[in-house]
Structure formats: structure tokens, C-alpha cells
Amino acid sequence: MKGVEKYEALLTEQTRNLGSDHPDTLTTKSNLADEYRDAGNLEKALEAYEAVLTDRARVLGPDHPDTLTTRNKIAYTYSIAGNPLKAIDMYEAILTDRIRVLGPDHPDTLSSRSNLAEAYSDAGKFQESIDMYETVLPDLTRILGPDHPRTLAARGNLAYAYNTWGSPQEAIGMFETLLADTVRSLGPDHRHTLATRGNLATAYMDAGKLEEAIDTLETLLSDMARTCGPDHPNTFATRSNLATAYDQAEKLEEAIGIYEALLADQNPVLGPKHPDTFTTRGKLANAYAEAEDPQKAIEINEALLNDEMSILGPDHPDTLATQSNLAIAHYIAEDLPEAIEMSEALLADQTRVLGPDHPDTLVTRGNLAAAYAKAGNLHKAIVMNEALLADQTRILGPDHGYTLSTRNNLAYTHLEAGDSRKAVKMYTDLLADHTRILGRDHPKTRAISAELTYLKNEKWRRENRK
């Protein structure tokens, strides 16, 4: 909180010597709000920004660039506070005003377009995000130049959107090209270069290239600690991503060890109630669940959920995500009535808060179907998965990872229901699509191939026993 204390003292001095309406005083008020935001105190940040906005609109006018910038910061804070839909409304209004006041080619106007694209991505509107980035990139290149940090950042965000949309192979190519350009134009230690390396590692993970992801993150972690310091939030984030890579590689003991060490470091540096600390607690709980210790996962998630309810509120996406993880832990513990009850309540909340088409809402529908299947209600699970598959195909597209996962779950449920012929047909089609989209060496492709081989061998054995 040193930054907060510094700006609070400066604000007191400037208010006394310059007056509350002096531009320098207003700038310090804005900087203080920035510090609140960066410390994770988003409620206080929003309160401070709103006060700055009122003062700047009164003193400088509603169309002054500083007033517009304050509105932009408020929208950004709403986005990271888990309210991207409100951020989208604000960004759209700011964009209209910046075009009118500053012109379409002003750097701030271009930033508004990029911010809007990012908010679309946060809201699960990936196609809108990609479309926006692809239209703003040529303008950024024309006006600011291809090597400007904002142009490079927009390229990174576009690649990130492709990866989130379910095209990790395409994202990898984009990130690798971008990395070469950022190293050349900004240098190997620039924050954009380091961020690109981290995003490339994430794309490697999503593409099933886990060894490449681990190697990239281990090297990046060393460079982050050297350039940013061991206690910098970006260094912490890299440690978290490295643990996630170990988790996905089924090296759960290593993942849990990294998460626990990270949590011990985040608590004194960021504070136990910081959003990043919450994220680590959630990831640690998930790792315990995957390590077949669901009771430990339940214990961690219940404590985390209580803290998120009080700090973030019941409707924050992170709070909803923890409810989802808690339901999954109950599912793994085979406490199916509790898992079903929690998932149904969560689905109602996500539909209300995020909307029925948000990816997180769709994931909960899939988890609920899986719980019904495990509880023996296979017909209900099949009906739910078929409806979910239709919606995912419409919203996310047929090649998205979530859509493919639902097809896999549907095939398995048909198999459990005794319809092996239909299951084999679905697995055969799914294997072809996984091979085309993810490649034959992706872990999910290999898993489907192994399942299909097993089913065909079982069919051959049954036929030869007749």
C-alpha cells in the first residue's frame, strides 16, 4: 500500500496548496484511484474514479481528453471487477464521444476500439472481439506504425482471442511471429515481449504441447524474476501458469507444491484478499481435486467462496467460478445430490448475470449433465447434452474445444446407456475432427483414439465369441 499512502499524502498537500480543482490535484486523485485498482480494491477505486469524473467534468468539461480518459478507466475497472457487459456499454459510449471530439484516428480513439474488443472477449463474445481487433489493427498500423507498442499489443490480444475461441494452433503462429517482432522492436526484456512469451506458453498448453509450455514458462519465470523482481504480480502470474502446465501434464505433486509456495508468497505481498491470491487458492483446490483429494478441495473452495462472497460479491464471475469448482469437487467425491443441487443453482445465477450464451454458463450445463449421467439418469444427461451441443455449435462454432468436449461426453453417455453402435459412430467422427483441429498428437486426440480402439476390439471379441 506504499503507493496509496504516497498519493494520499500528496493529495492532502496539493489540496491545501493548489486547491481541490487544480489540474495537478485532479491528476493525483486519478493516480490514487489507479493505486486502489492495482491493489485489488476495486470498490474503492470505482468510488475514487467516479469522484474524479465528477470534478473533471465540472472543471474541464465533459469533452476534455482527461475527462474521457477517466470514463475509460471506470469502464476498465468494471471489466476487471467482473462486469464486462457494463464495461461494453461504457466503452461504446466513450468510443462515440472520442470519435466526435478527437476524431477517428486519434490514438485515444484507437485505444477505445481495442478496449472494446477486449471487453467483448471478457464477456465471451469472441467473434465480436476478433472482428473488432481485425478492423482496428490496420488502422493502428497505418497511424501508429507496425512496431508501436499499441499495435503490437492489439496483435497479441487478437492472438489471445483466437486461442480462447478454440484455435490454439492459429494462435501459436500469431504469437510466434509477434514475439519475433517485439524482441526486435522493443527488446527481449520489454513487458510486451515477456507478456507475449507467457501467452505463447498458454497457447502451447491449449494445443496440448505441454513440454513446450513448461520449458517456455520456466525460462520466462527466470527472466521475470530478474527484470520485474520475484514479488511482482507478473512474476507471480508466471509461477501460477507454470503450476497449471504441470497440472495439465498430470504432474500434480509438482503443481500443488508450486501453488502452495506461491500462495505463501502472495499472502504477505498482495494480501490474502487480493484477486490474484483468490485465483491461486482456487487453482490449488482444483489440483487437489484432480489428485483425488476432493475433501481437501471442498475445504479450500468453501473458505474461498466465503471470502469472495464478502469481497467480490455473489454475482462476480470469480465467485461463480468458485461455486462451479466446488460443485465439481462434490462430483468427484461422488456426492452427486449436492453437486446437482449446486450446479442447478449456479446455472440459474450464471444465466441471470452472464447470460445464457456465455461460455461459463455453457460449461455449467455440461457439468450438470455429467452429474446426472453419473447419478444414473442417462436419458436426462443425453437430452441435456444434445441441447447443449446445438447451442455450443451456434455460439462457439463446431470446432471449439467446448463443443468437442460435449460431443465426447455425449458419445460416452450413449455408451453408458448401452448404445455402443451410436457411441462408436460418434467417437469415429470426433476422432477425425480432433485430428484435423488439434492434431494427432494432442492428448485429447490420443485419448479418443484409445477409447475407439478399445471399443472396436471389444466388438470384435464379442462377435468371435458367438
Place the predicted regions along the sequence by residue.
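Intrinsic-disorder-linked linear interaction elements in eukaryotic regulatory proteins
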Residues: 1-466
